[in-house]
């Protein structure tokens, strides 16, 4: 069995060593829930990577959005290049769920655009979980939505060995039943083709295809082939092919499901008639009978997911089968930014149920549509073996459920959490102006946090009227303009940035030495303990970082945030004294802010074009091979540009330029 092997050019330092040891001890002791409470910039991802390498268990990492998941996926890929690091997020580029708005009598049909490469990566994740244990899956909340049964996916796989007697006709029928499409002209992911005694299968979860060569009815050779160059990558003695989709059914599943759907339809029609909902009953009868006819003839119908419970043989109310069911029972879960991710996981079920209930009440769907849903919070928790929550500001759930809370407070740079002052609101604007001018004289920047957009805009106008170069950021500012504003702040073109919630920027601003929080004692989301600690962390990149809270009274949230910051600062100062460390402001080039924002947008694009770029690197040693590859890449680039996927087109363009430079260097 292959083990996790961590590759890193640096070793754990500071609090990382103790945090790794504590988490590993907890996992070995059987602790079900633990929390890693680490300040921003303390290297929490590297700590998690070390824990994975020492515990040696299949791992699921959940983040709260695709962008962060893509960043984590890339980091873990770098730490574990020899192991299976997989990416499991929603495969929809665009998704409009089916819904009904009673107030407007408006029915909205489901509309979606599926991303083929993300779909391949989802299948690759389940394939790896079936075949090996050294697996890390980085996912979003998509992992709590329904998938096909792992038993069906495993039981329906096809196994082929060299010297095996093989009926090609039978193999073709099996592949079609596994949702593979025959296409003898173009071989792509999820397809197969037959040429005489040779059958080529492109598994839906791989980036290369298999060629099975037969001598009459006997298998003589199995090879893995590169799809672009045609080069033989490896020869095998045996081969296992899994289904091309997660939702695959055994032969008797559809007839059995249709009987159950008819029974539920009859019961629901009686109920609607008794409630004098005749229009709803007629609508439901027409729609469901059409779906049944399609299921009987084609084995499929539009919106088949609404019949997932009857098809899978689940009882009403039973939890759906999800990605978590594909993991072995001893897997470990890491929840990144748990103070955001856990509430998001818990909210998915209720939001889905409200939408489905309208469809059921007004005769668009049978009650079984409710069972096509994400996991409830309690169901999700019941599937967990061991979990580690990761956050700088753990929520109530993490704090109450964790066997231990492991702190990681020391930054490798020696930087401390900022000093905090509380001042009365009387004369607050004049005080802010003086502090901003003092910062500007030292070539430092300032942030001012307000509660409303109007106040942010008015304050910006006021400061500009005083000659203080100021800009504002809020939800109406587009991404590109936001990047330009943040860049101008770092470059000194702007002295002050005013905003409402600057937490979501996710960008380090080492020049910021002063943060003013207006109305700091107002109770609400923007001034909760968690939000205040996150805001305070914005000044933790500068050695002279200071935060001033303007309030006429100290709220509980303020008190907790101040006490927590003071506690951290005391620990950090003691560590620095003991080790002779002098905190120094982080030095970053101004371009870093643009690069990082562009990296966020490019992460998803890299995932899309990764197979194509790897193919371009595989066999381009000759001028002819490079010329052929450039032509293929240029075609893909134009397709991406036509579909407005500009980040992907740019990555392909860069690869074309790289290949052309190789020819120039070789004098071709």
Swiss-Prot record:
Q: Which GO terms describe its molecular function?
A: ATP binding; ATP hydrolysis activity; DNA binding; excinuclease ABC activity; helicase activity
Q: Where does ATP bind?
A: 38-45
The protein's name is: UvrABC system protein B
What range(s) does the UVR domain occupy?
A: 627-662
Q: Which Gene3D superfamilies match?
A: P-loop containing nucleotide triphosphate hydrolases, UVR domain
**Keyword tags:** ATP-binding, Cytoplasm, DNA damage, DNA excision, DNA repair, Excision nuclease, Helicase, Hydrolase, Nucleotide-binding, SOS response
Any notes on this protein's domains? The beta-hairpin motif is involved in DNA binding.
Lineage, top ranks: Bacteria, Pseudomonadati, Spirochaetota, Spirochaetia, Spirochaetales
Residue intervals of the Helicase C-terminal domain: 431-594
Annotated SMART domains: DEXDc, HELICc
Helicase ATP-binding domain spans which residues?
A: 25-171
């Amino acid at each position: 069995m292959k083990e996790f092997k961590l590759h890193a050019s640096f070793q754990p330092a500071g609090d990382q060593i103790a945090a790794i040891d504590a988490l590993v001890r907890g996992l070995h002791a059987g602790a079900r829930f633990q929390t890693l409470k680490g300040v921003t910039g303390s290297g929490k991802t590297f700590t998690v990577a070390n824990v994975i390498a020492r515990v040696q268990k299949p791992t699921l990492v959940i983040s709260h959005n695709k962008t962060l998941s893509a960043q984590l996926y890339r980091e873990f890929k770098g730490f574990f290049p020899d192991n299976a690091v997989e990416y499991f997020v929603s495969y929809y580029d665009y998704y409009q769920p089916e819904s009904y708005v009673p107030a407007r009598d408006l029915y909205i049909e489901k509309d979606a655009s599926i991303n083929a490469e993300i779909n391949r990566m989802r299948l690759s994740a389940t394939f790896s979980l079936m075949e090996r244990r050294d697996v890390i899956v980085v996912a979003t909340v998509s992992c709590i939505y329904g998938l096909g049964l792992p038993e069906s996916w495993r039981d329906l796989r096809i196994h082929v060995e060299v010297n095996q007697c093989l009926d090609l006709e039978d193999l073709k029928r099996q592949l079609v039943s596994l949702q593979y499409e025959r296409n003898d002209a173009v071989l792509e992911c999820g397809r197969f083709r037959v040429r005489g005694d040779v059958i080529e299968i492109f598994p839906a979860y791989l980036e290369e295809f298999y060629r099975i060569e037969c001598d009459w009815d006997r298998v003589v050779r199995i090879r893995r082939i590169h799809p672009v160059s045609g080069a033989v990558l490896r020869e095998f003695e045996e081969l296992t092919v899994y289904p091309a989709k997660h939702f695959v059914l055994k032969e008797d599943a559809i007839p059995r499901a249709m009987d159950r759907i008819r029974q539920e339809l009859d019961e629901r029609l009686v109920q609607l008639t008794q409630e004098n909902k005749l229009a709803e009953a007629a609508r439901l009868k027409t729609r469901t009978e059409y779906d049944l006819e399609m299921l009987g003839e084609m084995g499929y119908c539009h919106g088949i997911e609404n019949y997932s419970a009857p098809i899978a043989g689940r009882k009403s109310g039973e939890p759906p089968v999800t990605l978590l069911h594909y993991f072995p029972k001893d897997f470990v879960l890491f929840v990144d930014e748990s103070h955001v991710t856990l509430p998001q996981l818990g909210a998915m079920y209720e939001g889905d149920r409200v939408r489905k209930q309208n469809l059921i009440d007004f005769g668009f769907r049978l009650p079984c549509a409710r069972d096509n849903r994400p996991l409830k919070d309690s169901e999700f928790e019941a599937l967990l073996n061991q979990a580690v929550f990761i956050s700088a500001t753990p929520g109530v759930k993490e704090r109450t459920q964790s066997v231990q809370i492991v702190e990681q407070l020391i930054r490798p740079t020696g930087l401390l959490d900022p000093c905090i002052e509380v001042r009365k609101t009387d004369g607050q604007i004049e005080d802010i102006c003086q502090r901003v001018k003092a910062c500007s004289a030292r070539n430092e920047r300032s942030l001012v946090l307000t509660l409303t957009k109007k106040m942010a805009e008015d304050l910006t106008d006021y400061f500009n009227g005083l000659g203080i170069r100021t800009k504002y950021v809020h939800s109406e500012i587009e991404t590109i303009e936001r990047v330009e504003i943040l860049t101008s702040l770092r470059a000194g073109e702007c002295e002050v940035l005013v905003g409402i919630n600057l937490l979501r920027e996710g960008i380090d601003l080492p020049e910021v030495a002063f943060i003013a929080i207006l109305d700091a004692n107002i109770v609400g989301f923007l001034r909760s303990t968690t939000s205040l600690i996150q805001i305070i962390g914005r000044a933790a990149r500068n050695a002279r970082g200071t935060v001033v809270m303007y309030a006429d009274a100290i709220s509980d949230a303020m008190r907790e945030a101040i006490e927590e910051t003071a506690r951290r600062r005391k620990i950090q100062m003691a560590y620095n004294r003991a080790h002779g460390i002098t905190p120094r402001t982080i030095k970053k080039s101004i371009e870093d802010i643009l690069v990082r924002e562009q990296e966020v947008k490019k992460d998803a694009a890299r995932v899309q074009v990764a197979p194509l770029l790897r193919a371009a690197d595989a066999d381009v040693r000759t001028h002819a091979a490079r010329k052929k590859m450039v032509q293929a890449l240029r075609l893909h680039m134009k397709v991406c540009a036509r579909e407005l996927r500009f980040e992907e087109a740019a990555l392909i363009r860069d690869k074309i330029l790289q290949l052309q430079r190789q020819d120039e260097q070789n004098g071709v």
